[in-house]
Amino acid sequence: MVNESRIDIYDYLYNLLFGVVSENVYDMRVPQELTESDTTDGFIVINVGSIVDESEFVGEAFGRVRCFIEAFVPQISRGRVNHDIYAAMENSINNVIKEQTETNEGTYYIEQDSILSMDDVEESSSDNSYFTFVKSFIVVIDKQSE
């Protein structure tokens, strides 16, 4: 049975994204107070869903969990999307996920057939409006017995 620490999954995703997609990476929710960099450069929020245990009786711990990366792109004048930041974040997220689907080894990896995306407009608790790009995928947890 998978007895996996959720924070380890957050750490796995954080380490993939920090400095590659953005320096502003948060777990679980939009922070209540945003930094100047958050409001000018944007930020991303990582969410980890429910872990589904798919272990078998052969001593292998195996599971899956749906995860979401939400990129918050600040608006420019008159509420328009900042195409440069949006494209940079979208491309960086897509590249990170693509690399992980090709790796397909280690304790965690991203399953290729489970990738979804969407976009929306959201407001932060500080009443800042953002365009959001959301990427959803399955992280596979593969722990071999020792």
Regions of interest found by a model, annotated:
Residues 1-59, 99-108:
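Small/polar-rich, solvent-exposed N-terminal microdomains that initiate assembly or binding
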Residues 1-12, 51-64, 104-146:
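Short, charged interaction patches at domain edges and termini
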Residues 33, 49-51, 72-76, 140-144:
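Generic structural motif
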Residues 63-75:
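Active-site-adjacent structural patch at catalytic or cofactor/ligand-binding sites
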Residues 76-86:
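Short, conserved charged micro-motifs
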Residues 85-93:
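Short amphipathic alpha-helices in soluble, non-transmembrane regions
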Residues 96:
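Extracellular and organelle-lumenal recognition/adhesion modules and their flexible linkers in secreted
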